[in-house]
A protein has these predicted regions:
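S-adenosyl-L-methionine-dependent methyltransferase catalytic core, i.e., the SAM/SAH-binding region
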Residues: 1-336
Length: 336
């Protein structure tokens, strides 16, 4: 969650900004890439340092006007592209010093009820972040029960996925599901909640559908690989995650393709050596927001930051990385 919204105005508080700045060291100058531009919080903070230049990327066209203002202000030091960050290799012409990913849903997207991300919305069941092939409405009305179950169970980590999927199919046989509130009612009737819960019963199903609609796992895996290809030796890739699936993927990539992997991973070829290390020694430590930041920006409470440093070794395509998480990739490839 990248921002919070006050009652009077929209304020941008990029998560763990101080930590990102400390890791990326923009005071030394260099070339940076903000792969999830959003409200521009990281980009603006980095561009304050005069010897920096930066490319901003975001799939959401709603951020374009803000990005254009930044282009005008910083001229040849900043350029914005409305593309998916998996296409970073199609944009970059030179290697970067730091590449930043702040994953997940921004509160700008969540607060805009017309986009259908919030289960408090009364609008269309959309959930598209931008440049998506289909909406959540199309997914829940067109996919089979088994496919819906897989999406909700695997991408949402929802234990009651089977009954939720069954009831979605049953409900749509009478009337097409078009509104957020309609899906919320189906989920609430399906869930076995016997006492008040801190977590809304729709949370995991909504997460699953959002991830599926925007192919977030496919984007993340391809984005990390392509970003690594365009990092300078000694360059840093910084990733902030907000749920366990994202963090598991990032951890695996950094840990298994670093020089100090403790034991040869069963996912790496037998001839694995330092020559197959894309990263320098990886410090397997999660950085979390401070208590003060969580008080000021409650959505940051679930954020986890990991970073890795690019080695001098030649880039290679890590096929086993894709194989390891093929279950997620196959689900996101369902035809709608």
């Amino acid at each position: 969650m990248k921002t919070i919204t006050s009652s009077s105005e929209t304020s941008h508080f990029p998560v763990m900004l101080n930590e990102v700045i400390k890791i990326s060291s923009p005071h030394k100058g260099g070339f940076f890439v903000d792969c999830t531009f959003g409200g521009g919080g990281y980009s603006k903070s980095i561009l304050k340092y005069p010897k920096t230049k930066l490319i901003g990327i975001d799939r959401d066209k709603s951020v374009t006007s803000n990005a254009k203002k930044l282009e005008k202000k910083f001229k040849n030091r900043f350029k914005f592209f409305q593309v998916k960050f998996s296409q970073i290799d199609k944009i970059l012409k030179e290697n970067a010093d730091t590449i930043i990913f702040d994953l997940g849903l921004s509160s700008l997207q969540l607060k805009n009820l017309s986009r259908g991300f919030s289960f408090h919305s009364k609008d269309e069941l959309d959930m598209t972040m931008g440049l998506s092939d289909f909406s959540a409405k199309e997914a829940v009305n067109n996919l089979g029960e088994i496919q819906l179950k897989s999406i909700i169970k695997i991408l949402g980590e929802e234990k009651e996925a089977k009954i939720i999927a069954k009831n979605i199919v049953k409900a749509r046989s009478d009337k097409k599901i078009t509104k957020v509130v309609e899906l919320v009612k189906i989920i609430e009737k399906s869930k076995k909640i016997k006492f008040p819960s801190k977590i809304n019963p729709s949370t995991k199903t909504f997460q699953a559908l959002r991830i599926f609609v925007n192919k977030e796992i496919t984007e993340l895996i391809n984005g990390m690989v392509n970003a690594t290809k365009y990092l300078k030796p000694g360059g840093k890739i910084v990733i902030i995650t907000f749920h366990s699936i994202e963090d598991k993927i990032v951890k695996f990539f950094f840990k298994n393709f670093s020089k100090n992997k403790s034991n040869p991973s069963r996912y790496l070829p037998e001839e694995s050596s330092d020559n197959l290390a894309l990263f320098e020694n990886y410090i397997n430590k999660i950085i979390k927001p401070s208590k003060e930041e969580i008080r000021n920006n409650n959505p940051s409470r679930s954020a986890k930051l990991r970073f890795a440093v690019r080695s001098k070794n030649n880039f290679f395509y890590p096929k086993i990385f894709f194989q390891k998480f093929n279950e997620y990739l196959k689900i996101e490839a369902y035809n709608v």
